[in-house]
Design a protein with these regions (language model features):
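Loop-to-transmembrane helix entry/capping segments in MFS-fold secondary transporters
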Residues: 46, 140-152
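Helix-loop boundary and gating motifs at the non-cytosolic
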Residues: 17, 28-42, 48-49
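Helix-to-loop junctions at the C-terminal end of transmembrane segments
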Residues: 63-75, 171-172
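A membrane-interface helix-boundary motif in multi-pass transporters
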Residues: 169-187
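Intrinsic disorder in cytosolic terminal tails and internal cytosolic loops
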Residues: 197-239
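Intracellular juxtamembrane helix-capping segments at the cytosolic ends
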Residues: 126-140
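C-terminal ends and interior cores of transmembrane alpha-helices
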Residues: 86-106
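Structural signature of the two symmetry-related core transmembrane helices
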Residues: 78-93, 184
Length: 239
């Protein structure tokens, strides 16, 4: 039987899951809405902008599986920490290869290194919500997986509301590269909070929990793709 779970109970079960969902919602909404704006401001051609968005999505999708395999073998919080700080590092390098600060010998002018760092950033960042969901499931029973997933996606949606606005403020204050500065700061916030949670709470092994790649939508529909959750019983129709 599927049990309900309040947001307060969800936060008590996994503070990292709730806080990270809000922060990551902010990150991903800004990433997918303003990446094309950033590329256009950096004088990328229409083809380059299309290629950038394609490479972002496909590399993030491919990385779901190796990241998920690793997270099932080690403490998921460590994987979250390495992923967030890794994404921050690659975002930092992307600043210096985006078109205004070319690398030596003109390598940056071909934008090869920008694509390279963007793909590396995507492979670290885009599996994050699935990691957060799997980490949260480590601390709850199987009959609450659906409710927890819905709660995390609600928290993700709250963050997604403010992401584009906050990122645009960074771009106004810092310039075009404020886009990546924003991503660096918010990824580091998740990583720092994960380090803090590791120090005050030991890891737990839950045999019912495993990494499942799910879409980072703001509705609970994605949870239906999770094979570890049991189907929700539909109410009987009144004749």
């Amino acid at each position: 039987k599927i049990k309900s779970m309040s947001l307060k109970e969800l936060y008590s079960s996994s503070p990292l899951g709730m806080v990270s969902s809000v922060l990551y919602g902010t990150i991903q909404s800004a990433l997918f809405t303003l990446l094309a704006v950033y590329a256009a401001a950096m004088n990328f051609s229409i083809f380059d902008i299309s290629l950038v968005t394609f490479m972002l999505g496909i590399s993030g999708a491919i990385s779901q599986y190796p990241v998920g395999y690793i997270s099932d073998k080690f403490d998921r919080r460590k994987v979250i920490i390495y992923s967030t700080f890794g994404a921050a590092i690659f975002a930092f390098f992307a600043i210096f290869s985006g078109g205004t600060m070319y690398l030596p010998e003109g390598l940056g002018s071909s934008k090869f290194w920008f694509y390279f760092f963007l793909v590396a950033f995507s492979m670290c960042s885009l599996p994050m919500f699935s990691l957060i969901l799997a980490h949260t499931n480590d601390f709850i029973t199987r009959d609450k997986f659906v409710a927890a997933g819905a709660g995390l996606q609600f928290a993700f949606g709250l963050g997604a509301i403010s992401g584009p606005f906050l990122c645009s403020l960074f771009m106004d204050l810092v310039g075009n590269n404020g886009f990546f500065v924003f991503l660096i700061i918010f990824h580091c916030l998740i990583g720092v909070f994960a380090v803090y949670r590791m120090k005050i709470r030991p890891s737990e092994e839950n045999p019912d929990s495993q990494f499942v790649a799910v879409p980072t939508t703001i509705t609970p529909v994605g949870m239906e793709l999770n094979p570890t959750t049991e189907p929700i019983e539909e109410p009987e129709k009144i004749k």
